[in-house]
């Protein structure tokens, strides 16, 4: 599997964390999030990949939306910020465990 494919898989697996990170301190509409992900990771998400997750995050009260000049703008809630911090801690730990595992069993 190529490095690009691994990165794409990781971003899609942890897309909720990526979205909460992008919205942390910024309000943004969906297509701008797609552009930010493309800029930061080189991955072009389809709206069909993004919008169902935005609705799920909104239903779970992790983000909220408002209409602004005909566009839906999303922003993170205090509950979303708390969830983001917890998920980041868990993600960092899992990366550390995986890195140690790879070091122990030999890198190629």
Region roles according to the model:
Residues 82, 86-108:
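Amphipathic alpha-helical dimerization/coiled-coil segments
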Residues 69-88:
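Basic, amphipathic "hinge/linker" alpha-helix immediately C-terminal to the N-terminal HTH DNA-binding motif
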């Amino acid at each position: 599997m190529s490095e690009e494919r691994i990165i794409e898989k990781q971003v899609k697996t942890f897309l909720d964390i990526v979205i909460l990170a992008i919205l942390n301190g910024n309000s943004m509409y969906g297509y701008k999030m797609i552009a930010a992900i493309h800029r930061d990771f080189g991955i072009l998400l389809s709206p069909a990949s993004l919008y169902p997750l935005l609705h799920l995050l909104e239903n779970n009260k992790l983000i909220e939306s408002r209409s602004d000049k005909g566009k839906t703008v999303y922003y993170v809630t205090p509950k979303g910020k708390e969830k983001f911090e917890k998920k980041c801690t868990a993600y960092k730990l899992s990366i550390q465990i995986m890195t140690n595992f790879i070091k122990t069993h030999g890198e190629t």
